[in-house]
């Protein structure tokens, strides 16, 4: 009997060892959640919430279990090139892809391939839904839910329009750029429907009678699709998977159900601290023969209301409502990972393609080189590596996600000799036993509209570099901006022309030169 008991114990021990080894060697799944135009208000860090009453309970909850990068940046603050660099690992410096053109028609990006290709070659199932790349290409995916859809948008019976509540001239910006406000239903309307969604170039009715009797928004559909897919994957637990989930809010038009607007009292809403004539010592507007969109939209918005305060309050109210709406969608996906037993087997990333200026620098858009355009939320949870309440202040950027996933998931891929992949793995920052934070920098670019001569590409564009202390901006005509974030986190004072900052200016300028030559 004693021998029998020893045998049973030994067998159980071997079984436990086998389970441990299998679990240790099992590849981690990956779920990457990417929002559109979500600035650092979605970082999950209270200190970064310059609008104090922003409500993002799901992001905040996830942040407590994640590695939170408090200085994370886009490499270009425009949708298509930002996403292209993220998913290919090729910097705009090397691809020279700076516009919203079709990314795979760029010869360098087409040859480079994507992180989806790398995961598939490593035996992963590759799944997606929503807005991932700016232009959808079916061959990137084994299975896909819904393509990008910026709806719902107001419908007048013939075409998409700006919402009827938006005054002129801002409403002239159209149904996407010039529209915001709660989804509603007009009294005594004779239209069968007053809202449409638009996917693959086709208008589709969006039915809304009340908050309880309505269609799901595109973001809600994508969240529920991901939830159902995770339930299916949790039941199989066979091959590992890479899932990307793309949400469009808070991209314009800023339309979400009214209960999200009700979270914020319009009259008592806290606003960022604005500086009058904030753009006076900057040089972006002087680089173009036309008024850049951000400056133009800002002027249109302000001139449409009785005061600047009223105008910005209306816009920011809609932006915050949209952020809270997408926060719920993020929570649906993360909660599904927990309920389906995938939480401890899955790397989770929450981020955005770039930030957004909410009126800072007299600018209402993205595609600028200042902090609010470039800065993004970046939260990463790696099972058995990330620790709770970990905040990492080292400057990093979206280009670092590709090498991070390759490193942590131990992926193998064919590194083509003529393809330069930039970025550095963040694993040593996530691992608290290492925490290598030394000398990291984030590089960003804005298209100067001068793309006709590839040999002079770098000289013809506008560049920025962000270190732990400084932001330096250099425009193609040689104009410069320098901001000391230790003393001026709002970037209100351009120090580039001050003699006593000449040494700092020369130092950081040389850092940018070195980065652009790599």
Question: Residue locations for each model-derived region?
Answer:
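Bacterial N-terminal signal peptides
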Residues: 8-16
């Amino acid at each position: 009997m004693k021998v029998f008991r020893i045998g049973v114990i030994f067998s159980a021990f071997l079984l436990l060892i086998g389970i441990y080894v299998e679990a240790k060697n099992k590849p981690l799944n990956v779920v990457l959640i990417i929002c559109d135009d979500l600035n650092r208000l979605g970082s999950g860090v209270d200190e970064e919430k310059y609008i104090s009453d922003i409500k993002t309970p799901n992001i905040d909850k996830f942040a407590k279990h994640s590695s939170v990068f408090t200085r994370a940046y886009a490499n270009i603050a425009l949708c298509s090139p930002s996403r292209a660099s993220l998913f290919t690992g090729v910097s705009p410096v090397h691809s020279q892809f700076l516009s919203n053109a079709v990314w795979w028609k760029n010869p360098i990006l087409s040859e480079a391939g994507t992180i989806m290709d790398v995961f598939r070659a490593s035996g992963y199932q590759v799944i997606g839904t929503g807005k991932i790349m700016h232009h959808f290409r079916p061959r990137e995916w084994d299975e896909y839910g819904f393509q990008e859809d910026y709806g719902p948008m107001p419908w007048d019976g013939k075409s998409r329009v700006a919402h009827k509540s938006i005054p002129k001239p801002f409403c002239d910006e159209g149904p996407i750029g010039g529209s915001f406000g709660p989804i509603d239903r007009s009294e005594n309307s004779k239209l069968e429907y007053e809202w449409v969604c638009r996917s693959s170039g086709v208008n589709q009715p969006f039915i809304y009678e009340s908050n309880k009797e309505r269609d799901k928004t595109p973001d809600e559909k994508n969240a529920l699709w991901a939830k159902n897919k995770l339930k299916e994957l949790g039941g199989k637990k066979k091959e590992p998977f890479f899932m990307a989930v793309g949400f469009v809010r808070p991209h314009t038009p800023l339309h979400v159900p009214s209960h999200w607007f009700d979270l914020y009292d319009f009259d008592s809403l806290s606003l960022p601290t604005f500086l009058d004539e904030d753009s006076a010592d900057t040089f972006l507007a002087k680089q173009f023969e036309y008024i850049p969109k951000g400056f133009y939209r800002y002027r249109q918005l302000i001139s449409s209301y009785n005061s600047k305060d009223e105008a910005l309050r209306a816009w920011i109210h809609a932006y915050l409502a949209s952020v809270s709406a997408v926060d719920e969608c993020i929570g649906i996906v993360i909660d599904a990972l927990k309920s389906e037993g995938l939480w401890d087997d899955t790397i989770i990333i929450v981020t955005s393609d770039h930030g957004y200026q909410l009126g800072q620098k007299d600018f209402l858009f993205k595609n600028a080189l200042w902090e609010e355009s470039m800065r993004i939320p970046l939260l990463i949870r790696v099972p058995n590596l990330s620790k709770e309440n970990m905040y990492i202040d080292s400057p990093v950027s979206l280009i670092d996600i590709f090498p991070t996933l390759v490193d942590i998931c131990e992926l193998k891929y064919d590194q083509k000799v003529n393809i330069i992949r930039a970025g550095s793995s963040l694993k040593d920052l996530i691992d608290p036993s290492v925490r290598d934070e030394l000398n990291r920098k984030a590089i960003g670019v804005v298209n100067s509209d001068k793309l006709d001569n590839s040999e002079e590409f770098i000289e013809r564009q506008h560049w920025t570099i962000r270190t732990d202390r400084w932001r330096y901006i250099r425009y193609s005509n040689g104009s410069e901006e320098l901001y000391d974030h230790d003393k001026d986190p709002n970037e209100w004072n351009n120090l580039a022309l001050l003699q006593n900052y000449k040494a700092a200016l020369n130092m950081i300028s040389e850092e940018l030169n070195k980065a652009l030559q790599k």
